Regions:
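Conserved N-terminal subdomain of the carbohydrate kinase-like
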Residues: 24, 48-128, 295-299
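Charged helix-capping and loop-helix junction motifs
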Residues: 115-118, 142-149, 195-201, 236-241
């Protein structure tokens, strides 16, 4: 079973307008609403790839109920911890000539709620996959990723960590099955600017030496690179298409890779991850099955 964790789920309210004038009343041409948060995005794309998952995390208030109901209608299992106070956040994304985002803060998460999440995670079994993605809300302990991986270290669980900087570096000692920084994040972690494939490979291998089992590096227009558990390097080019959306492309890549490794080998997983990321980038929302399959054929 695949489990995803989203600490701070959101409703993304996307507003399209021809021209945005600050300080004036603006009217939208159209609106969309999506249920978001990095782990939730992964669960949604996994569903498109016929992989069942269960979304964990925290929800609060009427917006939290809307998120849970919406995911249920999409066929996604959830087991969120319900917070007593506050509301799950709403992120406003304004798309005009320029794209503007105003992201909500989200509810406070107390120790009791954290312990309830830990209790749910303690039930994971050998062979399960756990995907941790995204930043940590201010009300959570900064080492919660470490605490989760430490609790599960005695089990044979595939852990996927999609985070950056110290959040990522501090969990490498627990040997996560997959990490996915992009090339810029990789450079930031080591205080260097990476200018070519050789340098990217060098520092990706450093992360592997520090404990990561597989290191997946997304490189935007230059494709993706994977250093697998055997130290072999795999490369994949980019999908061709018009970029419409940057939100969720990385999460989609994680979903595609996870589905691919459950269904095939590393080469296939890298291609499926690349296709899923591209399908989201070329769509208004998250990747759909037909677009993923179409792009996969081109890789």
């Amino acid at each position: 079973m695949v489990y995803t964790v989203t600490f701070n789920p959101a409703i993304d309210y996307v507003v399209h307008t021809g021209e945005m004038k600050l300080g004036s009343t603006n009217r939208s041409d159209r609106e969309e609403m999506y249920f978001g948060g990095k782990g939730i995005n992964v669960s949604i794309v996994l569903r498109e790839l016929d992989i069942q998952s269960k979304a964990l995390g925290f929800t609060a208030g009427f917006t939290g109920e809307a998120i849970e109901n919406g995911l249920a209608e999409m066929g996604i299992d959830t087991d969120f911890v319900h917070l007593q106070n506050g509301n799950s956040r709403i992120n406003v994304k304004i798309k005009s000539a320029e794209e503007t985002e105003l992201n909500g803060q989200g509810p406070d998460i107390d120790d009791e709620a954290v312990n309830k999440l830990f209790a749910k995670l303690d039930k994971l079994q050998d062979g399960d996959t756990l995907i941790l993605a995204g930043s940590i809300p201010a009300s959570l302990p900064s080492d919660i990723y470490e605490k989760i991986l430490e609790r599960l270290a005695h089990k044979n669980i595939r852990t996927v960590v999609d985070a950056t900087k110290d959040l990522l570096l501090n969990v490498l000692k627990y040997k996560p099955f997959l990490i996915k920084p992009n090339n810029h994040e990789l450079g930031e972690m080591f205080g260097v600017t990476l200018t070519n494939d050789e340098e990217i490979e060098k520092y990706a291998r450093k992360l592997k030496e520090m404990g990561a089992v597989n290191v997946l590096i997304s490189m935007a227009g230059d494709g993706a690179m994977l250093i697998d558990e055997n130290g072999e390097i795999h490369r994949c080019g980019v999908c061709n298409g018009k970029v419409k959306n940057s939100v969720g492309a990385g999460d989609s890549m994680v979903a595609g890779f996870t589905a691919g490794i459950l269904q095939g080998d590393y080469e296939y997983a890298l291609k499926l991850g690349t296709a899923a990321g591209g399908a989201t980038a070329f769509s208004d929302g998250l990747a759909q099955k037909e677009k993923i399959a179409e792009l996969l054929e081109t890789l």
